[in-house]
Amino acid sequence: MSDRFEATYLIETPHDVASVAQELAGEQSTATSSRMPGETDALIRDFGARVEHIEALPPAEAPSLPVAHTLGQRVHRARLTLSWPLHNIGDSLPMLLTTLLGNQTGMRRLSGIRLERVAMPQSFIAAQPRPAFGIAGTRRLTGVQGRPLIGSIVKPNIGLAPEQTAAMARQLAEGGVDFIKDDELLANPPYSPVARRAALVLRALDEAAQRTGRRTMYAVNITDGLDEMRRHHDAVVQAGGTCIMVNLNSVGLSALLALRRHSQLPIHGHRAGWAMMTRCPALGMEFQPYQMLHRLAGVDHLHVSGLGGKFWEHADSVLQAAHECLTPLDTQAGAADDRALPVFSGGSTIFDVAPTYQGIGTADLIFASGGGIFGHPDGLAAGCASLRQAWEAAIAGQELRAYAQSRPELAAALARGKPVRKA
């Protein structure tokens, strides 16, 4: 596959699958609704998409989406693999995305199309910027080795003045948190501009570091227009920051690529809006292509949701997403480590630690918790300590309650019990 790239789709149609597959391949390469004079056999051979494989699946009971359909007609499902010559897109990530999920998603004869996996030639992968810091760089900047980074977020997530955000960040840092991030809804509002918030928070973290001996990493949300993001980034650097954050789906691949070229700091990628792209099983994409696109563009940390949290995604899907982040893209000998640090968040507590570790088998992650820290009966420091202790137990293979017998912070968190999830 050195000169071609492949994509695998789940498709659904009331029409002949083989015919629809050929139409889909044509739509995303050389074909129009009818063959044009310039569409020669040679052009199709050199630039056309190919149907590589069709796997028939059990039929659907009814079309998942509106489609030209005769009542009672069988609705076919299939797994379809297409390939394209790499010279169709060159080294362009935006054009890769256009090819993978373009006009074919609106084809009238499809009642469902979902991108499942993408395989790219190593030459394409090597041409992309990919993470500048990744796992090793983040650990170096935080000084955390051998365990996950314990993270949190300042609450309330919006509405605080920079001085209030800084005061809360200082409490978290003095309590032992390794990583603090802005909420995805807080970027550069008039009541808390990036430059002032970053300056005050980072000064507070420096003061906390004088007491703790460790400087907490703060991911400053700089989501904005590209020119503004560059200016925000520079303000964070000037203030002594060690991380920036962007809402990936809001800024797009091109802005992320440009920011990666400009940035001197790790890029923390928030996937706000991801559910819109994946929650419908007949549309959108799986996480494998999503994380590949953003890691190729240079993101260092990537959210994957959490186990037992407040969001819809089930545990197996969350763990698979983390595995994808931790799977190298460039597998050539001597290639730089392009893995991204998966970020578990969204209601994570001590009760999610052991299944998280058992599910991914590594401590290379950020484990972000709000209620698990703020809600501890003995305060922030005890909440942070209880999470570290839960991870110590998981890594050592010890049962949580047994490990808590000599650790009052963990014991108190256990006594509080699991949070009650709303139905």
UniProtKB/Swiss-Prot annotation:
N6-carboxylysine modified-residue sites: K181
Residue sites binding Mg(2+) per the record: K181, D183, E184
Molecular function via GO: magnesium ion binding; ribulose-bisphosphate carboxylase activity
Domain of life: Bacteria
Cofactor binding, per record: Binds 1 Mg(2+) ion per subunit.
InterPro entries, per the entry: RuBisCO, RuBisCo_large_chain_AS, RuBisCO_lsu_C, RuBisCO_lsu_C_sf, RuBisCO_lsu_fd_N, RuBisCO_lsu_N_sf
Keywords: Magnesium, Metal-binding
Record GO biological process: carbon fixation
SUPFAM superfamilies: RuBisCo, C-terminal domain (SSF51649), RuBisCO, large subunit, small (N-terminal) domain (SSF54966)
The family this protein is said to belong to: Belongs to the RuBisCO large chain family. Type IV subfamily.
Protein name according to UniProt: Uncharacterized ribulose bisphosphate carboxylase-like protein
Organism field: Bordetella bronchiseptica (strain ATCC BAA-588 / NCTC 13252 / RB50) (Alcaligenes bronchisepticus)
